[in-house]
Swiss-Prot record:
Residue spans of biased composition, Acidic residues class: 1085-1103
UniProt feature, compositional bias: Basic and acidic residues: 137-149, 313-428, 530-554, 622-639, 939-952
Organism: Danio rerio
Keyword Coiled coil belongs to the record: yes
The protein's name: Genetic suppressor element 1
Gene: gse1
Keyword S-adenosyl-L-methionine attributed: no
Region (Disordered): 1-97, 137-166, 299-477, 514-654, 796-840, 881-994, 1050-1108
Superkingdom of the organism of origin: Eukaryota
Ranges annotated as biased composition (Low complexity): 66-79, 894-910, 918-930
A Pfam family: DUF3736
Length: 1203
């Protein structure tokens, strides 16, 4: 049996089962497969040794007819065994039918035997060997076995049916004693068959069954009878199926068989010879039971048919076969498990390899990304260089070309080209654009604005956002293309095989795009005759195309054209305001050509669109012919829409910068990934800034269609493309181009990374310039969003409000303020006198100065109060500044006794008090408070106070003194004081402007009061008449001078620095000292205080001056704070407890769930185990019951009579 060589393996042995049938058909061995034992290999007990022997035999043997049959059946059994031999064996199909395999009894066990028998050896060597072996083993059985074996051999050679060995009556299948080698080998084979059931296809099993039964048909088939003997009830049933009532003689015919075993074989042969096709298998299961409905083994059947044989022997054999089968089953199970384990290991290894590959791919992607970034950086640098060069060139050409622009159609074409470049290197192209602009770009820009064609060409020029036209198309296209490229690159990594094809595809796409561009753009570009510009574009173009490619490699995720389509320009259809990036679309000529171009790109499909800009040079070429007419048209359009660019050109730098910016922002939008964003932003800015642009806009009126064109044009860009759409488009393209596009590839992790990178890029981009297209704004408003500019305005308003509110005590404080007005006086055993006499007074004063507070004596407080009253009176107009000036003392006379220090301080405070309210800026104004310490905040506003000082600042030292005091006072009050005091003192000594002339101590309270009043008058006058600046300067000087005089309060010393010129000192008279007009006190304070604050909260704020509320206020505030804290703590504690309880409940639930999970898992495992058992049983039953597809016996095919 040619297949035999494979048989050698144990699996083969089991396969051999079929073979056995062939060999031993004569002998009962077919069942047992003892035939093999006859062969020395068989005696090796079906081990690898045996298998090897079988193999040798197979090689040596010629293939007898029977053997071939057996080999065919053998495949069946061998499948069970999973040996190579079984595979070949199937050719012996006829033998295959041996039923034994299902039972796993003799045939399966026989495999070793079978193997040998099928082996060609069977005919020659096998026969002789088997004979000898048989003789040895058959000794007990005697001649009958010998004869059987010889017959079997001859039968095999002849292929004629032989009497089954079991018919002959050998107690053991092959006449071998149970201990005989045959049996050993058979045992293993049996085990193999056991495994066979799992591994072997049912067909193979049936073959073995058939083979077992077929002993009649062929020598090999003769073994079949043994099968029935060894069958389990299940197996028996299967066997019975083979003995279809029609085919098998009914038990009633057993006598007949008994009488003539050969007759039996003859009777059965036709049935066994059923075509391998499985004539038998179709038999209804009922057929199986026909003979052995409940019989455990075909014993019943065999008894009747073999009544001549000793039934004891049959039963013995059956028993033995059962045992063998049992053992085989176990062994097979073990082998099955082993195989499963092996498969598991293999799978694990596979997974490991997969993981390795994945990591490798990841690393590759990482490297790719790095390279990409590197390339991007290089491109960026190149672009910058080019931009610089272009800008220079543009500047020189700008003005000259502005006028020539219209005339130069060629230039226009060039811009187109530039545009194309731009897509490729957005930044670069933009830069490039400026250059072309120099000669023709201006005109092209203009034309761009007007005719769509120019737009396309201008696109390059057209600085990003503005250019919704081809440029944006280009950009979008480019982005998409970049995306595509990147995708392709990824594919390349994942599938090197596809690399070339995909590259070609992308190339092809680019070519197609270019063609599209050429065709579609010809109309447009003609407007911009490329000639003039071409040189620049050309020199950029190659790189631009490359750049395009690069970009493709990292598309902007195929970002659709920027949402902020330049449409906002379109808003009014009026030429876009200079601020907006000019929207080429808006200027688009309505000419059919231009429109066609616009539409064409969209038709191109996103890739095409993205690429459209690429071919400018080609476009230009095409355009040349059309350029002339286009040029004229453009000129018209220029007239219609004066070149926006020209206006921009007038300020070439700005315009370019702005253009660049806008383009950049536009591009950024489109392709956040591109680093170009910066320049484009500039461009757009340029657009906005360029006044000339405005002029252009004014001229340019969009043609009625423009809107349409513009809209459609924009629509292409604006249309958001969903990822799914992109995916679909790519897939379609892949289908058309003939490469395989896998969804998985498109969505690997790198996609997520790209998206993340894209988002990062988008978020890092400078704010977009075109942020106010009505469409966009309306859309955003739906989500309570607004444009950045509008947001800034709103924020400004809010800030003003907030500032006002803060100035006016914020709403929440109001309650506190309400309380504060009536603070319960703090009880203290210290009187102000005690406090003033305390040894640490100096330290305390220093401490107070830290908080801009002044220590005031009782006298000072009184003075302050007086001043406050005076100011109040002035405010209420009961007293006028004039009266004060003429009569200062009466109003507030400070006792001369007061040291100038005191006087100065008190004025300060009083001034603070007076102005205090208005001064609101500093919360604490020194207002005399009942506070235990005669401390009041006088300094807080001091900085403010400085400004009010009269310009003249010719205050005598006293005045500076006062100023200083004022310093300590809230700024306003101090300014008032200064102005009040200044007049007299100024007169006294303008020289003493630097209060240095006199030490403060020299001043008398009265003088101080006078000075104070005068300074107040002056400051008011100043405030009214004088520009804040002068007064401030003077004040500062005064303060600086004064600083020489040292109050205890260090703050005074720093006054100059502190003094914060009132930005709006009350309009002070040029000469602050003479204040003829007496602005109402209110005005003064209001002006001073509020002017300081940018906000215009003048008079209203005055009342809400921050004043020193006294220590009580502090305590009160602290108390409130403590209360709030405790409330907050309570809330948090309760919340915390609630959460803890919740958490506890959740953890309990989690525990329960984990328990139930564990139980479920256990049950699942149990079920799985049960299922496995059931499955195993099922398999077993299947093996037993499936009818083998019985190949016709060789004899049948070769025309041997059935016998």
């Amino acid at each position: 049996m040619s297949h035999e060589p494979k048989s050698p393996s144990l699996g083969m042995i089991s396969t051999a089962t079929r073979t056995t049938a062939t060999v031993s058909p004569l002998t009962p061995s077919p069942l047992n497969g003892s035939i093999v034992p006859n062969v020395s290999p068989a005696s090796q007990s079906a081990h690898s040794g045996f298998a090897a022997a079988l193999r040798k035999l197979a090689k040596q043997a010629e293939e007898p007819r029977g053997s071939s049959i057996s080999s065919e059946s053998s495949p069946v059994s061998s499948p069970a065994t999973n040996h190579s031999s079984p595979v070949s064996t199937p050719k012996r199909g006829p033998m295959g039918p041996v039923i034994v395999p299902p039972g796993g009894h003799s045939v399966p066990s026989t495999p070793p035997v079978v193997t040998i028998a099928p082996t060609k050896t069977v005919n020659g060597l096998w026969r002789s060997e088997s004979r000898s072996v048989r003789e040895v083993e058959s000794v007990p059985h005697g001649v009958s076995r010998d004869r059987l074996s010889s017959e079997a051999a001859s039968a095999q050679e002849k292929g004629g049916p032989t009497v089954p060995a079991h018919l002959i009556g050998n107690p053991y299948p092959f006449g071998l004693t149970p201990a005989s080698v045959m049996q050993d080998s058979r045992f293993q084979p049996l085990n193999l068959p056991r495994q066979m059931p799992h591994a072997v296809p049912t067909a193979s099993v049936p073959e073995e069954y058939l083979r077992g039964f077929r002993p009649y048909a062929t020598a090999e088939e003769l073994r079949m009878p043994s099968l029935p003997l060894g069958l389990d009830p299940a197996t028996a049933a299967a066997a019975a199926a083979y003995y279809h009532p029609g085919y098998l003689p009914h038990p009633s015919f057993s006598h007949y068989r008994m009488d003539d075993p050969f007759c039996l074989s003859a009777l059965r042969s036709p049935f066994y010879q059923l075509p391998a096709g499985g004539a038998l298998p179709p038999l209804h299961p009922s057929a199986v039971h026909m003979h052995l409905p409940g019989v455990r083994y075909p014993g019943d059947l065999s008894h009747p048919s073999l009544s001549s044989l000793q039934s004891e022997r049959l039963s013995e054999r059956l028993q033995m076969e059962d045992e063998l089968r049992q053992r085989e089953r176990e062994r097979e199970r073990e082998r099955e498990k082993e195989r499963e384990r092996e498969a598991e290991r293999e799978k694990e290894r596979e997974r490991e390899r997969e993981r390795e590959k994945e990591l490798e791919r990841e690393r590759e992607r990482e490297r790719e990304r790095e390279r990409e970034k590197e390339r991007e950086r290089e491109r960026e640098m190149e672009r910058q260089k080019e931009r610089a060069a272009r800008e220079k060139a543009a500047e020189s050409h700008y003005l000259t070309e502005l006028h020539g622009l219209r005339g130069a159609p060629d230039d226009r074409a060039k811009p187109d080209r530039i545009t194309s470049n731009r897509p490729e290197k957005t930044k670069e192209s933009i830069l490039t654009t400026p250059k072309p602009i120099q000669p023709g770009i201006h005109q092209s820009l203009n034309s761009t604005h007007h005719p769509v064609p120019s737009l396309s060409s201008a696109h390059g020029l057209y600085l990003g956002p503005g250019g919704a036209g081809p440029t944006s198309l280009t950009v979008a296209t480019m982005l998409q293309r970049t995306e595509e490229e990147r995708w392709l690159a990824r594919q390349r990594k994942l599938r090197q095989e596809k690399e070339d094809r995909q590259y070609q595809v992308s190339e092809f796409r680019q070519q197609v795009l270019e063609q599209h561009l050429d065709l579609g753009r010809q109309g447009e570009i003609p407007d911009m005759n490329v000639e003039g510009h071409r040189p620049v574009p050309n020199h950029h173009e190659p790189s631009s195309r490359d750049r395009d490619r690069d970009r493709d490699s990292h598309p902007l995720l195929g970002a659709p054209p920027p949402l902020i389509s330049p449409k906002h320009q379109h808003k009014d259809h009026a030429p876009p305001p200079p601020t907006t990036l000019w929207n080429p679309a808006a200027l688009i000529e309505t000419s059919t050509d231009s429109r066609r171009t616009l539409h064409d790109p969209p038709s191109l499909g996103h890739y095409d669109i993205s690429r459209l800009p690429l071919p400018p040079s080609k476009h230009e070429r095409h355009y040349n012919s059309e350029k002339l007419e286009e040029g004229s048209r453009k000129r018209d359009s220029l007239d219609k829409y004066p070149p926006i660019r020209p206006s921009g050109f007038s300020e070439p730098n700005t315009f370019l910068a702005e253009l660049e910016k806008s383009t950049q922002s536009f591009l950024n939008q489109q392709r956040a990934p591109l680093s170009l964003s910066g320049p484009y932003g500039e461009l757009s800015a340029g657009f906005k800034s360029s006044g000339p642009l405005k002029n252009l806009q004014g001229h340019s009126r969009l043609a009625p269609d423009t809107t349409l064109v513009y809209d459609e044009f924009l629509q292409q860009h604006r249309r958001a493309v969903s990822k799914l759409d992109l995916e679909e488009r790519r897939r379609r393209e892949a289908r058309e181009k003939g490469y395989y596009y896998e969804l998985d590839d498109s969505y690997d992790e790198s996609d997520e990374e790209e998206v993340r990178a894209h988002l990062r890029r988008v978020s890092e981009q400078p704010p977009l310039k075109l942020d106010d297209s009505t469409e966009k704004v309306e859309f955003l408003e739906m989500f309570d969003l607004t444009t950045l500019a509008h947001r800034e305005e709103m924020m400004e308003v809010k800030r003003k409000k907030r500032r006002r509110m803060l100035r006016e005590r914020s709403p929440s404080p109001p309650t506190v303020q309400n309380k504060r007005p009536t603070p319960t006086p703090l009880l203290t055993r210290f009187t102000p006198e005690d406090m003033n006499n305390s040894p640490e007074l100096e330290d305390k004063k220093r401490f107070l100065t830290i908080f801009s507070l002044n220590h005031i004596t009782q006298q000072q407080r009184r003075d302050n109060e007086r001043v406050e009253e005076l100011l109040q009176a002035i405010k209420q107009k009961s007293v006028t500044l004039d009266t004060i000036r003429h009569n200062p003392h009466p109003l507030c006379r400070s006792p001369a006794a007061h040291s100038s220090d005191q006087s100065s301080q008190s004025p300060v405070q009083s001034e603070e008090l007076l102005n205090g309210w208005p001064l609101s800026p500093s919360p604490s104004v020194s207002i005399p408070q009942p506070s235990a310490d005669p401390l009041s905040i006088s300094d807080q506003h001091r900085p403010l106070s400085d400004p009010p000082k009269p310009k003249d600042s010719s205050l005598p030292p006293a005045l500076p003194d006062k100023c200083r005091a004022n310093d300590s006072l809230p700024g306003k009050s101090s300014s008032l004081l200064n102005s009040l005091r200044q007049p007299p003192f100024a007169k006294e000594s303008s020289v003493s402007v630097n209060g240095k002339t006199k030490p403060w101590e020299n001043f008398i309270a009265e003088e101080f009061a006078q000075q104070f009043h005068e300074s107040v008058l002056q400051s008011t006058q100043k405030a009214l008449q004088k520009s804040k600046g002068g007064a401030l300067v003077v004040l500062e000087q005064n303060h600086a001078v004064d600083s020489s005089v040292h109050y205890n309060i260090p703050e005074l010393q720093s006054t100059p620095g502190r003094s914060k010129p009132h930005p709006h000192p009350p309009s002070s008279q040029p000469n602050g000292q003479h204040c003829p007009p007496q602005p109402s006190r209110q005005e003064l304070s209001a002006e001073e205080s509020e002017e300081e604050e940018e906000e215009d909260d003048t008079e209203e704020d005055e009342p809400s001056t921050s004043r020193w509320q006294g220590i009580e206020a502090i305590f009160e505030a602290y108390q409130e704070y403590a209360e709030e804290q405790s409330i907050e703590r309570q809330v948090l504690h309760s919340q915390c407890r609630r959460l803890e309880a919740h958490h506890y409940n959740l953890s309990l639930t989690a525990e329960q769930l984990s328990h139930s999970m564990g139980e479920l898992m256990a049950q699942k495992q149990k079920l799985a185990a049960e299922r496995e058992n059931l499955q195993a049983e099922l398999e077993h039953f299947k093996k037993c019951l499936t009818l083998p597809q019985s190949p016709w016996s060789r004899a049948h095919f070769k025309g041997y009579p059935p016998r």
